[in-house]
């Protein structure tokens, strides 16, 4: 069994605050520029493709095997209560909206995690000369763009189910449409680093995800996974069992069971277990408590909490909507009232809520 290290950073934060995102059908896509921590990207050059022998423009699409059929219907969005979601065709339904409101929330969450890591984009000890990077479930692409800016010598590829990424990107960054749950078509030993973040409720087989990442990595390469728990907690009992925050988390966990795509990655320790099963070594774990709201006395944690609350409130209804229809199955008007109650609860200065989160990185053994 691989050694697991509890990183010392996981113990630095006070108990009241913090302790402690595959490859196939390719196409670069467009969306509004990020709203938080914006970079100054340039128009992308023609990007190199996976096998270096079939052209792939940074503003166009081509296809590859296995998941290539995704490309024919990527814009065939489904609409739920006026919000757009990724197409259900090909069995790749995802619970989050893919419209501008939700995307802004995702970008704010990126800012939260960057603040949490003291301005860093990763926890793994990466070489500055890193060459090829994969961002699985890239979302708006903000992490991939920022990473490409910070590591101009690296080729950064972000993959997602929805084409919501920006057109204007650094020349060393590109985006591809892909379902990470389908067999990966990357040749073995392609990447130096694979970044996986906030895929809760979207992966049915976490061990398989890490096995595919293991195969796609070069010997000595790193995989990194950052996932929140599906819960709102408090150390002083201010988040009660009947709180709307608690009931919201319970709804998500139940929805994960019903869909077969768990929200319990943190509580079930799926990151560490999956990495161990895949064959990774030097597994390092960092646990965090991200405050919800500005309640912590520590200025940095208070700022993080403000942004976290802003991220949640930015699209609280959109974040609830899919699971509400799946689990609760009551009129949408009731969901909106429930969202109001959750928002009100978060804003109470006496509620000291936080969300447990876990960053895990590990290395593929040298050949």
Task: Identify the meaning behind each predicted range.
Residues 127-188, 193, 208:
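Class I SAM-dependent methyltransferase SAM/SAH-binding core
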Residues 3-9, 278-367:
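C-terminal lobe and adjacent flexible extensions of AdoMet/dcAdoMet transferase-like proteins
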Residues 201, 222-317, 321:
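Conserved catalytic/acceptor-binding region of the Class I
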Residues 207-222:
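A short glycine-rich, Lys/Arg-flanked "PGG" loop and its adjoining helix->strand segment in the class I
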Residues 189-198, 224:
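Short SAM/SAH-binding signature in class I
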Residues 84-85, 90-92, 138-141, 161-164, ...:
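Conserved beta-strand elements of beta-rich interaction domains across eukaryotes
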Residues 97-132, 142, 146:
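Conserved alpha-helix/loop element of class I SAM-dependent methyltransferases that forms part
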Residues 2-98, 104:
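N-terminal auxiliary segments of SAM/dcSAM-dependent transferases
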């Amino acid at each position: 069994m691989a050694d697991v290290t509890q990183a010392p950073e996981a113990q630095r934060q006070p108990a009241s605050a913090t302790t402690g995102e595959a490859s196939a059908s390719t196409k670069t896509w467009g969306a509004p520029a990020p709203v938080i921590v914006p970079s100054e990207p340039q128009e992308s050059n023609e990007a190199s493709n996976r096998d270096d022998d079939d052209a792939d423009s940074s503003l166009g699409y081509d296809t590859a095997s296995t998941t290539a059929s995704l490309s024919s219907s990527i814009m065939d969005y489904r609409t739920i209560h006026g919000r757009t979601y990724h197409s259900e065709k090909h069995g790749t339904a995802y619970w989050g909206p893919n419209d501008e409101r939700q995307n802004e929330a995702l970008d704010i969450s990126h800012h939260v995690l960057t603040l949490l890591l003291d301005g860093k984009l990763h926890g793994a000890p990466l070489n500055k000369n890193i060459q090829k990077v994969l961002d699985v479930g890239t979302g708006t692409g903000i992490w991939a763009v920022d990473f490409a800016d910070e590591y101009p010598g690296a080729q950064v590829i972000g993959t997602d189910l929805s084409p919501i990424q920006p057109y204007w990107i650094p020349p060393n960054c590109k985006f591809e449409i892909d379902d990470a749950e389908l067999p990966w078509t990357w040749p073995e030993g392609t990447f130096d680093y694979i970044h996986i973040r906030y895929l809760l409720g979207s992966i049915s087989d976490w061990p398989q995800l890490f096995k595919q990442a293991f195969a796609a990595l070069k010997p000595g390469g790193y995989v990194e996974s950052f996932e929140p728990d599906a819960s709102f907690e408090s150390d002083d009992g201010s988040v009660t069992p009947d709180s709307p925050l608690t009931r919201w988390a319970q709804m998500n966990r139940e929805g994960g069971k019903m869909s077969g795509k768990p929200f319990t990655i943190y509580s079930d320790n799926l990151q560490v277990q999956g990495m161990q099963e895949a064959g990774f070594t030097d597994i390092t774990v960092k646990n965090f408590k991200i405050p919800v709201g500005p309640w912590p006395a520590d200025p940095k944690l208070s700022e993080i909490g403000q942004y976290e609350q802003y991220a949640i409130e930015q699209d609280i209804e959109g974040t609830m909507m899919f699971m509400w229809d799946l689990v609760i199955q009551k009129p949408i008007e009731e969901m909106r009232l429930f969202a109001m109650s959750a928002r009100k609860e978060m804003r109470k200065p006496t509620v000291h809520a936080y969300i447990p989160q876990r960053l895990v990185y590990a290395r593929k053994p040298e050949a």
